[in-house]
């Protein structure tokens, strides 16, 4: 109010001054044009100026808060970890029935009956009842027979040997690594929630799908890790050491010393069981949850090789030679699935 009253009084004085100048000009015989020019020059030289801001501290605090907000907003998107996995599409009715029929065929397998909860303790027919972990004979989803008259391509020799999928315990694992033979090792050592959370804090570069807010993850990992997000200037990770740190049982297994961990990712339960297959490398570990393992030969080997399917559970370690098999994991059950994807090849 004081500032407005001040400006009004200034303009009143200027108006009086202009009237006085105009009268004086007329008395001195000046022309109207000369008087207007003189008044314009007078007004330009005496234009009223606004005073300094009345609350400089408040304005300074406002600018600081605005700048800090912009910095935090930018930093959030710069260091935001990998976004969550895209939601899986719900299959149409035809595809749902196809998936249902596919799983009905899986349930009819002897190995599936062995591991289903309602069939625990029911012995298998024949000599299989004496074996705790029998070799799993492959089955073909195409019911195709091998054509012995056709030559076997070089990249199909591994799966064409019909080596059964060996299911074993860690202490019964062969001492020598057999690269061509598929293997499932039942360790019975799943990852706990605390181990998974600690691992995601320590090695955020090798985790994916663990959706958390920026400040939520920072607060959970503090003070163990000050900045639990991937950043480009960090030293390269020793992924072989990380694999054995997360799963100490690998120190007792015959896999190559340079076997390494590629990534651990979290998969939420799917609306339609079996609607999504997740491809992994030749070596993997099921940290938690239940899944179906599927080994599919390359397309050019379908006439000589057969697909393999088997249910797996938390703590299971699987291996299949990537040159002869495509390895897929299909989530099942209602619990989230944690898959740690690795490899026995040093160049990956």
From Swiss-Prot:
One of its GO terms (biological process) is connective tissue replacement. It is a single-pass type II membrane protein. Residues 80-348 are extracellular. Keywords: Cytoplasm, Glycoprotein, Golgi apparatus, Membrane, Signal-anchor, Transmembrane, Transmembrane helix. It is found in: Golgi apparatus membrane; Cytoplasm. One of its GO terms (cellular component) is Golgi membrane. The chain crosses the membrane at residues 59-79. InterPro entries: BRAP. Homodimer. Interacts with BRS3. Interacts (via N-terminus) with SIN3B. Exhibits histone deacetylase (HDAC) enhancer properties. May play a role in cell cycle progression and wound repair of bronchial epithelial cells. This is Bombesin receptor-activated protein C6orf89 homolog. It comes from Mus musculus (Mouse).
